[in-house]
Amino acid sequence: DKNHPFDNKVISGEYPPGSPFKIITGTAALDLKKVTPEEMIFDSGKHWLIDKRNAEGEALGWLNFNKALAKSDNVYFYEMGNRVGIEGLVKYAGYFGIGEKTGINLVGEASGNMASPAYKRKVYDEDWYLGETFDAAIGQSFTLVTPLQMAVMLSEVANGGIKYRPYVASRIDNKD
């Protein structure tokens, strides 16, 4: 952005997380036993409750959790959002640090935001609808994250649930 050339977008830019958020939705659904990894859900190209579709409108047929995550299937994760509910999504997003600063030792870090009925009521004075839960389940709606928050969330998954606070080192004393 030529009007803000010195903004550190890694810590201060806030963007919809999109499909990586499906990891949080899936974690919530599995942990709350709203789905098993083996359960098959049929994707006809749109959800059966609300006309919410896959990005390209494609129908992917029968999918279990692993295949849905690998294909980044919106319809499957709309259903996980439906089963978990917005309260569950908000809770699990908080476990992964969504809507909170990472604590990096840099000035200007943004906290992002997790979509919720309370946020919508506060900002827009409007009711929450199921379609917004579906959007939140796939990382859209009012959810905003910094690139660093997404990196921390994904590293937590890669590290088996161990979350490390990021920091900028001033020096490295030795290679060990």
Which role does the model predict for each range below?
Residues 1-19, 24-176:
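Beta-lactam-recognizing serine transpeptidase/beta-lactamase-like catalytic domain environment
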